[in-house]
Amino acid sequence: MADVKKVVLAYSGGLDTSVILKWLQDTYNCEVVTFTADLGQGEEVEPARAKARAMGVREIYIDDLREEFVRDFVYPMFRANTVYEGEYLLGTSIARPLIAKRLIEIANETGADAISHGATGKGNDQVRFELGAYALKPGVKVIAPWREWDLLSREKLMDYAEKHGIPIERHGKKKSPYSMDANLLHISYEGGVLEDTWTEHEEDMWKWTASPESAPDAPTYIELTYRKGDIVAIDGKEMTPAQVLTELNRVGGINGIGRLDIVENRYVGMKSRGCYETPGGTIMLKAHRAIESITLDREVAHLKDELMPKYASLIYTGYWWSPERLMLQQMIDASQVNVNGVVRLKLYKGNVVVVGRKSDDSLFDANIATFEEDGGAYNQADAAGFIKLNALRMRIAANKGRSLS
């Protein structure tokens, strides 16, 4: 292990990564640089600085990445209407490429020869972090302590921390029974009673959203302005990407929007139950499809829908920096040139209802689509030839006696 002189650690300041910090120092006899990302998780990140300093860390990075996260990762993903396995809005998955990118940048800045993370050997995050790291710095060494050590329970971690003088709170405030991960897009819950797929989640688990039953009895109306597929204003007020998502989380949470309880297929092979709150993302998905419905050509819209599951899978499995994801992104972004306009939504007790959409780039032609007299805008007699031509192959098959059953 003498080949490792300096390691950049993705550090939260919690029990797991604090133990990892000390374990790296002792096991590899190396210098550790800590990196703490503020992705809008809602927790104070500065205590991580004090804890790292107390453990002898000299180079400490605490970065506010909220704007970059939403602008360069969340927004591009939502241009594709991305959903994994029909439901999951990829709140955890989309944060990992940015963390990997910043780990490598700091490694380059500090001359570190390795990076380290606290993802376990059972989950997807180890794959996401490491695929990103290798794509951005092929020769980097990655240290994943959960795949090396025998500290495989919380109690063993606590004992290690006490033995090595790592500041912890064994008898502090009550710890959540769930494993949680949060950023500006979502908060996730795993473990505890959720490991029984028949057991209903507890109401007090949810942190961001009101229950639909207790949400306001009066609906909330909002208008979202789109420019090239991205939201740039709410109710006419221009906002940055992070401000947009923060406000949508707030108003969506009040109205009980964005709760999800699913069993998903992890990349490593197992099924895992997770509960998610994604109020802002749920609103964004509904609104984006609405503005696309009047601005996208039919075949472009259908092609996007065909490509989306593959795009979603690439993000879920950690291939954000792959050539195929980058290729798909160029196609998706090209489709958004005319996705401009305003969507009006009604938020009510867990529901997002589209009640209006308008655009100077709209392909909706009321003169042609009307059920009333159209003044010759559309010749209905043209449909006869259209139908006969499209039926030709089936007519030929029928004349040949081909069976239809």
Swiss-Prot record:
Residues bound to L-citrulline are 88, 93, 124, 128, 179, 188, 264, 276
Q: Which family does it belong to?
A: Belongs to the argininosuccinate synthase family. Type 1 subfamily.
Enzyme's top EC category: ligase
Molecular function via GO: argininosuccinate synthase activity; ATP binding
Entry-linked HAMAP family: Arg_succ_synth_type1 (MF_00005)
Q: Which SUPFAM superfamilies match?
A: Adenine nucleotide alpha hydrolases-like, Argininosuccinate synthetase, C-terminal domain
- Catalysis performed (reactions): L-citrulline + L-aspartate + ATP = 2-(N(omega)-L-arginino)succinate + AMP + diphosphate + H(+)
Where is this chain primarily localised? Answer: cytoplasm
Q: Which InterPro entries match?
A: Arginosuc_syn_C (IPR048268), Arginosuc_syn_N (IPR048267), Arginosuc_synth (IPR001518), Arginosuc_synth_CS (IPR018223), Arginosuc_synth_type_1_subfam (IPR023434), AS_cat/multimer_dom_body (IPR024074), Rossmann-like_a/b/a_fold (IPR014729)
Gene Ontology process terms (BP) = argininosuccinate metabolic process; L-arginine biosynthetic process; urea cycle
Q: Which gene encodes it?
A: argG
Gene3D superfamilies on file: Argininosuccinate synthetase, chain A, domain 2 (3.90.1260.10), HUPs (3.40.50.620), Single helix bin (1.20.5.470)
Q: Which NCBIfam families match?
A: argG, PRK00509.1
Assembly and interaction partners:
Homotetramer.
Binding residues for L-aspartate: 120, 124-125
Q: Where does ATP bind?
A: 10-18, 37, 118
Q: Which UniProt keywords apply?
A: Amino-acid biosynthesis, Arginine biosynthesis, ATP-binding, Cytoplasm, Ligase, Nucleotide-binding
Specify the protein name: Argininosuccinate synthase
Q: Where in the cell is it found?
A: Cytoplasm
Pathway per the UniProt entry: Amino-acid biosynthesis; L-arginine biosynthesis; L-arginine from L-ornithine and carbamoyl phosphate: step 2/3
Task: Provide the organism lineage as a comma list.
Answer: Bacteria, Pseudomonadati, Pseudomonadota, Gammaproteobacteria, Pseudomonadales
Q: Name one Pfam family in it.
A: Arginosuc_synth
Q: Any idea of its EC number?
A: 6.3.4.5
Q: Which GO terms describe its cellular component?
A: cytoplasm
